[in-house]
Amino acid sequence: MQIAKILLSAVKLFPLDYLIPEDLSLNIGDLVVVPFRNKELTGIVWEFSNVPEVKKLKTIKEKVPLNLTITSEVLDLIKWMSNYYMAELGSIAKLVLPVDIAEKPIKVKEQKINNNFTLPDLSEEQKQALQMLNDSNKPILIKGVTGSGKTEVYFYLIAEYLAKGKQALVMLPEIALSTQIINRFKERFGFDPIIWNSSVTKAQKKMILRGILEDKVKIVIGARSSLFLPFKNLGLIVIDEEHDDSYKQDDGVLYNARDTAIVRSTFDKAQIVLCSATPSIETMYNANIGKYSVINLSSRYKNAVLPNIEMIDMTKEELPKNCYLSNILIKAIKNNLENKEQTLLFLNRRGYAPLMLCKSCGHKFTCKYCSSWMVVHKSSKKLECHHCGYQSKIFNSCPECLEDESLAICGPGIERIEEEAKTLFPNSKIAVISKDHVKNPEKIAQLLHQMENLEIDILIGTQMITKGYHFPNLTLVGVVDADLGSNHADLRSSERAFQLLHQVGGRAGRGNSKGMVYLQSYYPDNIIFSYIKDEREDNFFVNELEVRKAADMPPFSKMASVILSGTNEHKILEVAKNMVRIAPEAQVKILGPASSLMSKLAGKYRFRILIIADKKFNLQKYLKFWLELIKIPSFCHIKIDIDPKSFY
């Protein structure tokens, strides 16, 4: 009797066996409707086997209408991800089919491609870049200064693939970034791209999946999950802002969408293009060893000039209590307002203040579920944990010593900078962009429209505003706390700080007027600032690679992280210690166990073991063997993170 193994997103570990009806002809990759518990689900035909008659097996009901199939290339990607990231097949299947499409056929509107595109003229440098893109058969890095027109170059490439009848995917790290790109796309190509991100409804996702499976959708702009869409005829993948940490998923299936996209491009025989003004260290390493081709765009588009960058030594500033904008920056903002030009104030910290404490007994308000401070949000009049979302009221007296009027709010958040700016510049139009202030694409689009139409004088933003936005009249950027994030005990803290400051500075002077960037710092001699100030990003990459090589850290080695978590701190630590004690002998370096930087998260205590090995070592095989040696207690949850990006 022939059995089909059906991969279901509802079953994480392995495909389930189903009987094949005699009148049903199936192929690997076909989408079928199967009974599962008390409902019917869509599954993927994974493989076939012949077994003696089995009475208890359920029978496949039918093929999904229109005989839709998942290509062998996507199936290969699922297998690769399961092996490389040590993830359950069903969890990866849910990435490919996030909604069930086992329903009556949905009428999908086909994207009408008009090849008479109105693309703008390219500069000579951009034309050379396009020629290199056409000539290369490797992954390509477009490394261009902020505002160099990387988007215009890959728009030309998209046009070429659409003319060939191919599908194209443009990946962006944030939903917020998509608004301006979509508008530019519609302006250039004359039709709407399909958008795929967390704001897309379930019904819309069903329609999009159908359209892709029927090859009616030609161009998708999406977040990291768009990588798993079941394209039939994928010709091009573009990863914009490839360095961004948002491409790494830290829950569910732990994967890096950038790295997985490169693998997918090999399966689909598609061209892949990585874009960034500040590429990741891993990408620069691959470029240096010849694995990737590199295109350098050294000039800003339409001859715009790069901004000047100046340090402000905050140790020499005498500021009033609870004020955070230096006299130099205030004067520059006043100048900008007089010249009718826009200003961006950047602080990568949400809320009003990062800490509330008691001046009498020293009590700090921390999250009851996490090892983190509660952030003061004045606008909502609440304390909030930015890790698990727990909220509480703002107290009038200390809950520990009961002292009245003893509570102090420490440090600035973005709301506090807004308050200070409104006091200093009462007649200016001020807006704030952060996850708390703009929670959906419509709000973002509205704010961007206001910026473009000069309805905002001062924009105050978190890292949301650093990625790819183009405001021609924005000529001044003030970084309120340039030290934030640069001194963390983290492999990538210097890299992240450099990228963030470089990107936010790149928002200034993208139009006809030259820009100015001020970095406020209590440690102005930090070497990172000199790299940014003197436009020596290549020196930064060389130095950072040397540091990593000396420490035998990625990209010169492989790394995996084993995270153990549970509600009993002592028991979890004992499991972690025992795991290290029985680790198989091999050419690996094992560090830990140690408390994660976030030692308690959502009520669970967390310990981390790091494993470092030579690049040629089969780390996954080693980890599988190691995990088979230990019986994991039910109170302990284990996650494997291959190529970890953070250590929180």
Swiss-Prot record:
Binds 2 zinc ions per subunit. GO terms for cellular component: primosome complex. Its cofactor is Zn(2+). Its EC number is 5.6.2.4. Gene3D superfamilies: P-loop containing nucleotide triphosphate hydrolases (3.40.50.300), PriA, 3(prime) DNA-binding domain (3.40.1440.60). NCBIfam families: priA (TIGR00595), PRK05580.2-4 (NF004072). This is Replication restart protein PriA. It comes from Rickettsia bellii (strain RML369-C). The lineage of its organism: Bacteria, Pseudomonadati, Pseudomonadota, Alphaproteobacteria, Rickettsiales.
